[in-house]
UniProtKB/Swiss-Prot annotation:
The protein's name in its UniProt record: ilv operon leader peptide
Keywords: Amino-acid biosynthesis, Branched-chain amino acid biosynthesis, Leader peptide
Record gene name: ilvL
Any one biological process term the GO annotation gives: transcriptional attenuation
Organism field: Escherichia coli (strain K12)
Keyword set includes Repeat: no
Length: 32
């Protein structure tokens, strides 16, 4: 379970790092 959780967390982090920057910049500039 721990290994699975680590793999899942790594995948989620990688996906977030890939997806968030452009969306975060757009949302940040749009809201702020």
């Amino acid at each position: 379970m721990t290994a699975l959780l680590r793999v899942i967390s790594l995948v989620v982090i990688s996906v977030v790092v890939i997806i968030i920057p452009p969306c975060g910049a757009a949302l940040g500039r749009g809201k702020a």
